[in-house]
């Protein structure tokens, strides 16, 4: 009986907040709920996926490519006809927690409800209350552009059976409070594993390789485990937290590709305590325990790569790959260089990179280097100065990345 009364009171309180918020009037005590909801929406990076280039925030329409076709993100502004204006808090919670939309249909996991299911009801309600206050935008979005048969929603039943289990996060009493807060953010709202874990042929995360890195939108999302070479093992928790705030690890590396958007729209807005909690949790992730080859196979193009590096890169990054502190990042020991996939280094050489937090911008070399020359430089950098990555950049890979999206 007590539980029922509490639920009724909570529902009434939320209804009061959302009703007044939708009318532009806030009752006493509503502001903290809305501020918390805005903060949590930032933590979940909702705006990045639900905003098309040049479009209104949260109005949807962003193209999300998958191996099975593409989706367009839906409008989640409070517009009554094309957004979620007619959704109740229960409708919203069912979508976030169970992956079922207002019409009772299984949702596609381009919406990461397999991670958001861990978020508490109170936090989901706060996000809902906040979204009720954003500007309603009339924007009809035809979300489903998947190939047959994946375009048929009933096919999601098999995927859900294999890869989805609903359940709110439960703290581990044996772990410190910071670790538990970090786990809640990383495994829930932050949905870090969604991009940083490889997926199988059906689009399910390979749990045995969780957080070990994966290709996303043509970029390689780096290994987040405590691996000393390719992951975060050599980083302090403070360095990880600082990276989430600024997008730069001083004198080591900078964010690339989609991660730059994550920092810009999400992690830089988090509190120092939350960023540090996420860092503490990531530091505890075990590395890949499988045996690794101790010796990198010889690269027959190494001589060409060394010459090209000297002519095009050595002036800034120095002969020993150490860079210049605060001006040019080092390449020796750089986690981007050491990543399992060479794609990020290829893109940086080919397209350059904008100025970030003190580092001078890097020019693009794609206009003057052939695909073979870019591959030679990348392989040289990945196997020099103690770097022990595999020299697996090829001209064909460079060509594919040149033809792909930015």
Regions found by a protein language model. Name each.
Residues 70-78, 219-225:
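Acidic/histidine-rich, surface-exposed loop or edge segments in extracytoplasmic proteins
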Residues 2-16:
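Bacterial N-terminal signal peptides that target proteins for export
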Residues 29-31, 38:
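Boundary of Sec targeting at the N-terminus
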Residues 304-343, 347, 355-358:
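C-terminal structural cap/anchor segments
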Residues 84-100, 104, 126, 233-236:
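Aromatic- and charge-enriched surface segment that lines or borders ligand/interaction sites
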Residues 345-372:
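Active-site/pore-lining binding-face segments in mid-to-C-terminal subdomains
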Residues 17-28:
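C-terminal segment of classical bacterial N-terminal signal peptides
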Residues 31-32, 43, 51-70, 102-183, ...:
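Flexible coil segments in periplasmic/lumen-exposed cytochrome c-class electron-transfer proteins
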């Amino acid at each position: 009986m007590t539980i029922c009364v509490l639920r009724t009171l909570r529902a009434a309180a939320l209804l009061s907040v959302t009703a007044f918020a939708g009318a532009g009037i806030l009752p006493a005590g509503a502001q903290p709920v809305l501020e918390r909801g805005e903060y949590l929406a930032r933590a979940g990076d909702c705006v990045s996926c639900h905003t098309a280039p040049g479009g209104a925030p949260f109005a949807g329409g962003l193209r999300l490519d998958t191996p099975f076709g593409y989706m367009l993100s839906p409008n989640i502004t409070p517009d009554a006809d094309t957004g979620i204006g007619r959704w109740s808090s229960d409708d919203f919670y069912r979508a976030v927690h169970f992956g079922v939309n207002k019409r009772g249909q299984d949702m596609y996991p381009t919406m990461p409800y397999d991670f958001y299911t861990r978020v508490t009801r109170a936090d989901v309600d706060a996000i809902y209350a906040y979204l009720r206050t954003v500007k309603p935008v009339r924007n009809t979005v035809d979300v489903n552009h998947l190939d047959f048969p994946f375009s048929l929603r009933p096919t999601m039943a098999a995927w859900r059976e294999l890869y989805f289990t609903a359940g709110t996060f439960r703290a581990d009493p044996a772990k410190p409070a910071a670790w538990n807060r970090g786990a809640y953010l990383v495994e829930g709202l932050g949905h870090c594993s969604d991009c940083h874990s490889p997926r199988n042929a059906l689009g399910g995360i390979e749990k045995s390789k969780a957080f070990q890195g994966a290709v996303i939108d043509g970029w390689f999302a780096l290994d987040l485990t405590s691996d000393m070479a390719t992951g975060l093992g050599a980083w302090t928790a403070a360095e990880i937290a600082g990276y989430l705030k600024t997008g730069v690890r001083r004198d080591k590396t900078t964010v690339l590709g989609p991660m730059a958007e994550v920092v810009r729209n999400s992690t830089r807005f988090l509190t120092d305590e939350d960023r540090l909690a996420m860092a503490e949790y990531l530091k505890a992730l075990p590395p890949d325990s499988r045996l690794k080859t101790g010796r990198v196979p010889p690269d027959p193009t190494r001589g060409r790569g060394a010459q090209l590096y000297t002519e095009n890169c050595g002036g800034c990054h120095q002969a020993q790959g150490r860079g210049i502190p605060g001006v040019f990042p080092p390449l020796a020991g750089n986690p981007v260089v050491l990543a399992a996939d060479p794609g990020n280094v290829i893109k940086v050489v080919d397209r350059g990179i904008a100025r970030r937090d003190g580092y001078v911008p890097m020019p693009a070399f794609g206009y003057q280097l052939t695909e073979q020359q870019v591959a030679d430089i990348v392989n040289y950098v990945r196997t020099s100065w103690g770097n022990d990555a595999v020299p697996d950049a090829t001209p064909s890979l460079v060509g594919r990345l040149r033809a792909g999206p930015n």
